[in-house]
Amino acid sequence: MLQPKRTKFRKAHKGRIHGKAKGGMHLDFGAFGLKAQEPARITARQIEAARRAITRHMKRAGRVWIRIFPDVPVSSKPTEVRMGKGKGAPEYWAARVKPGRIMFEIDGVPLAVAEEAMRLGAAKLPIKTRFVARPGEQA
């Protein structure tokens, strides 16, 4: 699973995800992509599950690019522990995703295969997504 090799700080504030994506909104590598329609924190496990679903449907033909990286540590306290006594230990890593962000890109497969692969990958994610294609491709 994806996670940073090292970080400046061990724990992060929760924060809120405001506004729309200001970068990573266009297809840069592949001919087809999966674009986020809602803001959310996508966990490393969800990214990996979506990647597996996409590559499995493509039967390892073509290429997949993951355009988001889980760089935010999400902490949680153990179950049945009273409030207070500090912040919990980092539990997993997540990526903050804003609406309009391209999360996955694929190339080297026909349109029908790409659409179905992205549909299967989107089912593993907790947000609404949209399939996008380059203007040159038959969308």
Swiss-Prot record:
InterPro entries found in the cross-reference section: Ribosomal_uL16, Ribosomal_uL16_bact-type, Ribosomal_uL16_CS, Ribosomal_uL16_dom, Ribosomal_uL16_sf
Keywords: Ribonucleoprotein, Ribosomal protein, RNA-binding, rRNA-binding, tRNA-binding
Entry-linked SUPFAM superfamilies: Ribosomal protein L16p/L10e
Upper lineage: Bacteria, Pseudomonadati, Pseudomonadota, Alphaproteobacteria, Hyphomicrobiales
GO CC terms of this entry: cytosolic large ribosomal subunit
CDD domains: Ribosomal_L16_L10e
Organism: Parvibaculum lavamentivorans (strain DS-1 / DSM 13023 / NCIMB 13966)
Domain of life: Bacteria
GO molecular function: rRNA binding; structural constituent of ribosome; tRNA binding
Alphabetical list of Pfam families matching this protein: Ribosomal_L16 (PF00252)
Known function: Binds 23S rRNA and is also seen to make contacts with the A and possibly P site tRNAs.
Biological processes annotated in GO: translation
Description of how the protein assembles with itself and partners: Part of the 50S ribosomal subunit.
Gene3D superfamilies reported in the protein's UniProt record: Ribosomal protein L10e/L16
Family named by the database record: Belongs to the universal ribosomal protein uL16 family.
Identification of the protein by name: Large ribosomal subunit protein uL16
